[in-house]
Amino acid sequence: MDKKEVQHHRSQQAMTKSLYAIGMGLLGKSATNMDCANTNLESAGKSSSTNYNRNRFYNERFVPMASGTMPSVSGTNHHSRHQQLLLQQAPKCTADLNEKLVKINRQNANKELSTIQAKDMQSVDKNEEALKELQESIPEINKIFDVHCRIGSGTFSTVLLGTLQRERGLVETQRRRFAIKHHNPTNHPERILRELECMYRIGGVENVIGINCCIRYNDNVAFIMPYMTHDRFHDIYRSLNFPEIRDYLRNLLIALRHVHKFNVIHRDVKPSNILYNRRTGKFLLCDFGLAQRIADDGSVVQSSDLSSREVFSILRDLENGRSVTLTDGNSAQAEAEDYMARRRMRALGGGGSVERAVTGPPSIQKLREQAGGHLTKKDVANQRADTMRLLNRLRLVSPNADPNNYVVSTNTSKKEMHASRAGTPGYRPPEVLLRYPKQSTAVDVWAAGVIMLSLLSGLHPFFKAPHDCGALAEIINLFGDMPVRKTAFLLDRLILLAQKVNTLDLRRVCMRFRHADFFLAPEIQRKYQRPDGTTEMCRSCEQPTFNCLCSNSGHNLERYDGLDIFPAVAYDLLSRLLEVNPQKRITAEEALKHPFFSDQHRITPGIPLHQQQLIMHQQQHIMQHQQHLQRSRETLPSSAARTLKAFVCYPMEITSTASQAAGNI
């Protein structure tokens, strides 16, 4: 062998010795012994044949056999003892490492368990506190109901789960469950009376929650309402499919249509005030604490405007009424256990809506693989940063803006502007933010549109400004400055803006948030990159030109056929619900007649829209032909039985005393 080969073999031997010694945790001793071995071998011979034999010796020495032992070499007893020592101590090192890992895992598990137990104890403390407060405030409750647990709480009230004491002997599935809403003593009596009036006169039908009875003891009031199991909107809004979203919105609009027939504005339509059971499909609109009635002249009737005669009429109707029994077949114990289980699951995790908007649901994994395989941590970080940049663009507001003085009336004769601003931030329409006094039921329609926007975009909450000025800026950043300026002018208001803002396309905005990983895939980014590695950006929406969100974009856009699960009519309904001008905004009754709620609009992912429309048209033609043949052979009785349905009217009445409630519920 020449000198180069000898040097190469020596370098490999030194590296192998070091790695072997490090792996056994005995680098110091083994390195010293190896140096001694090198000295002895170098003095043994200097010819090339001797070097070759020495290299072969070291190579054979560090090759383990299948049995875990090392090959024996004559004249190397000292090194063989070291090999046996290393092999004996290797299992000991591995065992110590495993013990340390088990100890660390045990410590982490104990910390996690202690955190869960602390949260459970805190929940139990709040539960016991709510039960004790209800029992002390209204002692009559203990004579009628078995109160189990707290199922909800708010600023003005606490809701608890209860069952009738006289039904203790029944099977658990046959016991009726009730939601006991205990109003805080700080709650204004007019608010309680308004909510009671709405539930008594409006509720009980058309997806609107009703009331069984009302119990009053001194200054404390409790509403007894039917109980329904429901899912948290935050847990299901990204996993709902197209039929479920359509049914959800249909039920919401049915409830709003019924409420608006009584010239009542709910004013607090939001997901937390909607009880929706995904398994059963049941739906209820609740919480009428902010509801307001519209007068004949179009103005909103304030609570203080109610005359004593109207108040006496309401109380008289409540006093003369009788209770209504509502049956339900769910188990109270099962519902309480499910509720506590959901609370524990929520305590274990969470996750922000921005992160979920970037990562997407599991179903998008196939699209991600088609777009270009797996993403690195850097790609995910870039996607999140881009999504946050878009959110900041939508929620941009000047830091110098005064949140308390941003609306100016064009009529200088009016010194002050008095308008109702009740509602939840993020769901208030432009007319409320502009403090327009003559508000209508279009306020609730806008809130329904915001809920639909969250369902289609997969982003909740979509609007989250801390004050009215920021909320109006969010609306301007999405719908442009000109529609808001025109609406403000029609409402006798004036808006001053520092710059113009273009209108964004609602469909592309929803697609951008719902399928963020697809539009931000590295392969698509490289597809539209310039030679210098940069990407052309749109100056208006601050997005890449291939993913421009402007409504009248002239850029070369990336196509998304087969990616969107919603038809075009869904975004048409969304634009009508979110009409900036309240006078042009669609009503709940008109929205129910929209083609979006027709069964013919079904979208299959992966198939272009024009092919799906052709298939749906052919299927519709075949179904119409079959129905025509079937009806031509129908007799009159069978046709009547198919079209006519029996209608039974159950009058809704109420009782106001605890004794009557105990005997009539």
UniProtKB/Swiss-Prot annotation:
Interacts with chif (via N-terminus). Its EC number is 2.7.11.1. Probable serine/threonine protein kinase that forms a complex with the N-terminal peptide of the chiffon protein and may be involved in regulating meiotic processes in the male testis. The keyword Nucleotide-binding applies. This is non-specific serine/threonine protein kinase. It comes from Drosophila melanogaster. The active site is at 268 (proton acceptor). GO terms for molecular function: ATP binding; protein serine/threonine kinase activity.
